[in-house]
């Protein structure tokens, strides 16, 4: 039986270099899905590219740790009105305002539908914040209400003791294609690991990009260019097929 592989490029809309990299990896490589950051400065550029390449499925990358929120979020923003990674401190202290988060989720979803002209194919999140135990039930209920698939990290489920209510998702998710020591063999090892789990659908996260001034300020910069080179390698797609996988998206879940 042919297995489903979703190669999802996160951070669509982050900057033009990221946007162009994702499109290149879709057109000339194995990226088969992407997720858009609705509060990013170059989201309109992403929507223009999406209109040029409508075959690329686009989901929503829910953001609570970067940029400015679309709604008032005094409990999660600093003096400059910016979101940040201090969300984990607030979560650990039990001070997250779930009403604020729910309103921001709804607003990001509504903006997605407005600018892309359709609902997202699925939902995931920046820095995997939707897998935090306080936030997951809220996002899972929202996805269920909207009849949308959701990225599920089974390691986070086990770590936090989360209860899954049969969400639409891939059977396995792997965030391992990330970091300094990336290669085509390391990508293919993720498929082999999924086979060891006995699953028939796998999502792999990636961040292919061309480097621009925005990404030069990111803590994860040059590996994005390495990702792009690997994901557009002419030998990768045949190697994926040889292992019994077909490329697809959350529309296939």
UniProtKB/Swiss-Prot annotation:
Listed GO biological process terms: chitin catabolic process; diacetylchitobiose catabolic process; polysaccharide catabolic process
Q: Where does Mg(2+) bind?
A: 61, 126
Record has S-adenosyl-L-methionine as a keyword: no
Q: Where are the transmembrane segments?
A: none
Which terms in the GO cellular component ontology are assigned? cytoplasm
The pathway is: Glycan degradation; chitin degradation
User: Which catalytic reaction applies to this protein?
Assistant: N,N'-diacetylchitobiose + H2O = N-acetyl-beta-D-glucosaminyl-(1->4)-D-glucosamine + acetate; diacetylchitobiose-6'-phosphate + H2O = N'-monoacetylchitobiose-6'-phosphate + acetate
Which GO molecular function entries does the Swiss-Prot or TrEMBL record give? chitin disaccharide deacetylase activity; deacetylase activity; metal ion binding
Q: Which EC main class describes this enzyme?
A: hydrolase
Its keywords, alphabetically, are:
Carbohydrate metabolism, Chitin degradation, Cytoplasm, Hydrolase, Magnesium, Metal-binding, Polysaccharide degradation
Write out the function statement from the record.
Involved in the degradation of chitin. ChbG is essential for growth on the acetylated chitooligosaccharides chitobiose and chitotriose but is dispensable for growth on cellobiose and chitosan dimer, the deacetylated form of chitobiose. Deacetylation of chitobiose-6-P and chitotriose-6-P is necessary for both the activation of the chb promoter by the regulatory protein ChbR and the hydrolysis of phosphorylated beta-glucosides by the phospho-beta-glucosidase ChbF.
Instruction: Spell out the protein name for this chain.
Output: Chitooligosaccharide deacetylase
* Species in which this protein is naturally found: Yersinia pestis bv. Antiqua (strain Angola)
């Amino acid at each position: 039986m042919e297995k489903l592989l979703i190669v999802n490029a996160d951070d669509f809309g982050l900057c033009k270099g990221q946007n162009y990299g994702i499109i290149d990896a879709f057109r000339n490589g194995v990226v088969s899905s992407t997720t858009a950051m609705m509060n990013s400065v170059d989201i309109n550029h992403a929507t223009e590219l999406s209109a040029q390449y409508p075959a690329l499925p686009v989901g929503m990358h829910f953001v609570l740790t970067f940029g400015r929120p679309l709604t008032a979020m005094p409990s999660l923003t600093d003096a400059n009105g910016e979101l940040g990674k201090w969300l984990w401190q607030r979560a650990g202290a039990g001070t997250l305002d779930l009403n604020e988060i729910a309103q921001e989720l709804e607003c990001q979803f509504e903006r997605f539908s407005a600018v892309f002209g359709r609902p997202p194919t699925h939902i995931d999140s920046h820095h995997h914040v939707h897998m935090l135990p306080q936030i997951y039930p809220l996002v899972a209920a929202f996805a269920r209400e909207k009849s949308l698939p959701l990225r599920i990290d089974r390691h986070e489920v086990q770590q936090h003791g989360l209860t899954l209510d049969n969400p639409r998702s891939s059977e396995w998710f792997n965030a391992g294609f990330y970091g300094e020591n990336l290669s085509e063999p390391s990508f293919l090892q993720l498929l082999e690991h999924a086979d060891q789990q006995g699953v028939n659908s796998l999502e792999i996260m990636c961040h292919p990009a061309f480097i621009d001034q925005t990404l030069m300020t990111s803590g994860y910069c040059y590996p994005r260019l390495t990702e792009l080179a690997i994901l557009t390698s002419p030998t990768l797609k045949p190697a994926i097929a040889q292992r019994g996988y077909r490329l697809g998206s959350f529309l296939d879940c």
